[in-house]
């Protein structure tokens, strides 16, 4: 791709977004997907897979803080964390900030993502790949959760959209495997797209997860990079109380963890579970 051109996202047929390409840093087709990182004056370094924006330096902190601190602080004493995907290292970066976590396992299907993100997205991983608690496994996520003998307190599915390599991470086989290796009272979370534009994705996840967990819901965050703005995250656990913890409890845990965030706080945590009526109506209609 030439520099000083426009890169157009291909996620939606009838509408979308574009980024000016100031400088292409990396572009390669791996065995699994088409990877590109380019620089944009407004959003910094932008990474896309198969024509879909995955992350930008400008706003990645919102996504990663919400996918890690919400389940970890709701759980309260997570020791073992599993990340599915997350090859850019930012999810790992946020989990490593929790000093009580003892092991962090990341399963990434594409070794190429990890290697080039270490070089081209250093602000994302911020040295977290060198944390002694971290183990990298190159494997298919569905295979791992159905075969591993390890168990986890929190599982974070940092999956791409349900197309291409990421499609298997939205299947019943994956959700069943996650339930299999989740400790009692554990929490599973996953990105579930922009619900206003991809509502079927959320409904499908809710329907499938409900077969394996007693408490299934969603929480949301405003992330400009993802077209439509309001990203939805799936939430699943067998401890019904964890979704309804008071902001005072979350604030106490947040303070004890010594965290300082740019987006996440205890009020955001509580408010994130307040969903728009159209989603409540759609879930009730299933």
From Swiss-Prot:
Residue ranges of domain PABS in the record: 5-238
GO molecular function, one term: spermidine synthase activity
Enzyme class, spelled out: transferase
Key words of the record: Cytoplasm, Polyamine biosynthesis, Spermidine biosynthesis, Transferase
GO process annotations (BP): spermidine biosynthetic process
Catalytically driven reaction(s): S-adenosyl 3-(methylsulfanyl)propylamine + putrescine = S-methyl-5'-thioadenosine + spermidine + H(+)
List of catalytic residues: 158 (proton acceptor)
Pathway annotation: Amine and polyamine biosynthesis; spermidine biosynthesis; spermidine from putrescine: step 1/1
Cystine pairs: none
Highest taxon listed in the record's lineage: Bacteria
Residue sites binding S-methyl-5'-thioadenosine per the record: 33, 108, 140-141, 165
EC number: 2.5.1.16
Role, per record: Catalyzes the irreversible transfer of a propylamine group from the amino donor S-adenosylmethioninamine (decarboxy-AdoMet) to putrescine (1,4-diaminobutane) to yield spermidine.
Family: Belongs to the spermidine/spermine synthase family.
Oligomeric and partner information: Homodimer or homotetramer.
Protein name: Polyamine aminopropyltransferase
Organism: Salmonella typhi
Organism ancestry: Bacteria, Pseudomonadati, Pseudomonadota, Gammaproteobacteria, Enterobacterales
